[in-house]
């Protein structure tokens, strides 16, 4: 059974000229890092929002771990972690207080929660800043706390929307390296959106390049690159397939 199965998924927002998603279908194997890649407005975030139950599809179907998103969302939410692009933290609370709050939401308490928080703060180099208010954090520090909040409950599937956008090179590398090791150590499936194709090329086992709500191509990054003549990167592949840069809006 695949981790995610999507069939003919469509989404058209009210008053929109074009659909945000135009009949996309794919299957994502378990224990893989899968990237949805493309420019802003391509349909990446809409896809993840439907999988999380934040947005309802216009038509089509989606399953996570064999459960129908439209019918079994309550059960699905117990086994997924969501890390949104917009920082979902309380700025007046400290990093530790934020993590305690999110841990409590998942039913974690006492020493179990304390040990998890201590472990991840150390992993992400945040121990010395744990008792500072989030409003005092840099963008990279906020991203790291945001990620920790999404994995405290040991999800079977982790969904990340642009997890490294707007951060410094050091934080970007730290997050990418962690996702690789976390995937290997736990066999967790990771879904990830990005318009940073160089990063995705190194991180993802498989990618789907999306443009104007459609999947342009899908497969292992190096396989896709090798199949295209005079192509040496995902960025070059995107330009060849769409006629524009991923940075174009």
Feature names for model-found ranges:
Residues 218-219:
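ABC ATPase "signature
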Residues 100, 104, 111-129:
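Conserved ABC ATPase "signature" region
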Residues 1-6, 10-23, 30, 73:
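A short, flexible loop at the N-terminus of ABC-type nucleotide-binding domains that lies
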Residues 173-186:
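Helical segment within the ABC ATPase nucleotide-binding domain
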Residues 158-162:
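Catalytic Walker B motif of ABC-type/P-loop ATPase nucleotide-binding domains
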Residues 152-156:
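A short, proline-enriched helix->beta-strand linker immediately N-terminal to the Walker B motif
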């Amino acid at each position: 059974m695949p981790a995610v199965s999507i069939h003919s998924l469509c989404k058209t927002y009210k008053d929109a000229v074009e659909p945000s998603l135009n009949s996309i279908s794919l299957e994502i194997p378990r224990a893989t890092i899968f990237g949805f890649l493309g420019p802003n407005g391509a349909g990446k975030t809409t896809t993840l929002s439907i999988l999380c139950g934040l947005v309802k599809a216009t038509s089509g179907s989606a399953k996570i771990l064999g459960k129908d998103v439209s019918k079994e969302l309550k059960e699905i939410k117990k086994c997924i972690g969501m890390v949104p692009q917009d920082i979902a933290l309380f700025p007046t609370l400290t990093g530790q207080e934020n993590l305690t709050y999110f841990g409590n939401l998942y039913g974690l308490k006492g020493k179990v929660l304390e040990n998890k928080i201590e472990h991840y703060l150390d992993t992400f180099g945040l121990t010395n800043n744990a008792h500072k208010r989030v409003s005092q954090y840099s963008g990279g520090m906020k991203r790291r706390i945001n990620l920790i909040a999404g994995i405290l409950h040991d999800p079977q599937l982790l969904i990340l929307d642009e997890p490294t956008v707007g951060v410094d090179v050091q934080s970007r590398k730290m997050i990418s390296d962690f996702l690789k090791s976390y995937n290997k150590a736990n066999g967790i499936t990771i879904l990830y959106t990005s318009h940073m194709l160089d990063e995705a090329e190194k991180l993802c086992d498989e990618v789907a390049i999306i443009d104007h709500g459609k999947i342009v191509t899908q497969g292992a990054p190096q396989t896709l690159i090798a199949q295209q003549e005079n192509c040496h990167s995902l960025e070059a592949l995107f330009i060849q397939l769409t006629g524009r840069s991923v940075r174009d809006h």
